[in-house]
Every structure is written in structure tokens, then in C-alpha cells.
Amino acid sequence: MLAGLSPHLSNLRRSLTQVLNFALVLSTAFMMWKGLSIYTNSSSPIVVVLSGSMEPAFQRGDLLFLWNRSPRAEVGEIVVYNVRGKDIPIVHRVVRAFGDDEKSPKETNGQKKKKVMSSGKKDSIAAGALHSDSALVSHRILTKGDNNIADDTELYAQGQDYLDRKLDLVGSVRGYIPAVGYVTIMLSEHPWLKTVLLGIMGAMVILQRE
């Protein structure tokens, strides 16, 4: 009886080993991803270019590596940001930056210098007004695709004229590998490929068992 169960136990052991190996691969990949996210301070340290708006600098399918520990994003720098309310990363270049050490362009153009009044209550009011005028704004940027005519104002959330460095940016591009991420685009645009891929993986598992 035990001899008859031996082949079944062997097959079960082999199946469990394959499941554990697969789980180990997934957990290792997840840990590496989370570790890279912590190191780069980016929720998505690796992204794929989905459109041709940054041609010729980047093509569709290019794999980008991001870094998000710099306090500022300078003009000319290529960044990745998420539009508020949407989960689609956009890769564009910074064409204007301000904040932290200067005032918002709209605020600067719309404000007038206030005269200091000479006595009592008027002095305190004027001092408060001057303090308000000199208040710094958070670092904000305006972006644009190299292959686009207009800037990204129309892409931002409703009522948003600029991106906030801390709230909107996923990271700045520090490196890339051409065309490697095109598989991701193909799977996204052609869902049936996922079924084919899963079928191939299943066939490979069955063949390995035999």
C-alpha cells in the first residue's frame, strides 16, 4: 500500500516545491521593488514611456529609472508625474520652476508694494502685509513634452496651473534602457496576449513535471 502511494507523494512533493519556488520568486521581486522604492524615495522607481510626446529624447517602450530625493526639479530636467485623480504616469520636461526662494509668477505680477504707515495700529497692519508679501511658496514646476506644441496646463487637474514638487512628482529620470518596456505596452493594448502568455507558462510547468 505504501509502495502504491509513493508515486503520488513524489508528485505532490514536486508540485509543492514548484509552488514554493514560484512564491519565492514573487516575494523576492516584491522585496526588491519595495527596497528600490525606499532607496529612490519614489512610489514607482521604474516606469515605461507610453507615448511619443518626448521624442526624440525617449521613444515608446523605453524603460526609465527614477530618483526622487532631490529637493528641486530644475528647468530642462525630465520628470515623471501623476495627474491628480488619475493613475497614469506622464514623462515630460520641466520648462519653468519657482518656489522656495521666489514667489509664484501670478502672485508676483498681481501684488503691489505696500507703504509702511507711521504710527500705532497702522504700523502693525503694514508689517503683517509685508510679511505676507514675502512669504515663500512651495517648489512648483511647469512641464511640457518635447514633441508637443503647448505646455501641460491642460493635462493637470482642474484648477491646477503648476505641479507641486512634493505632491505630484514621481521622480526625475536618471537613466533608461531603450525599448525594453515595449512588452508592457503590448500586453496593455492587446489583452489576449496575456492569455497566450499564461498558456505558455502553464505548458512549461506541465512539461517540466513530465
Curated annotation (Swiss-Prot):
It is a single-pass type II membrane protein. Residues 196-207 are annotated as: C-terminal short (CTS) helix. GO terms for biological process: protein targeting to ER; signal peptide processing. Residues 39-210 are lumenal. The active site is at S53, H92, D152. GO terms for molecular function: serine-type endopeptidase activity. Its main location: endoplasmic reticulum. Keywords: Endoplasmic reticulum, Glycoprotein, Hydrolase, Membrane, Protease, Signal-anchor, Transmembrane, Transmembrane helix. The chain crosses the membrane at residues 22-38. Residues 1-21 are cytoplasmic. InterPro entries: LexA/Signal_pep-like_sf, Pept_S26A_signal_pept_1_Ser-AS, Peptidase_S26, Peptidase_S26B. NCBIfam families: sigpep_I_arch (TIGR02228). This is Signal peptidase complex catalytic subunit SEC11. The lineage of its organism: Eukaryota, Fungi, Dikarya, Ascomycota, Pezizomycotina. The gene is SEC11.
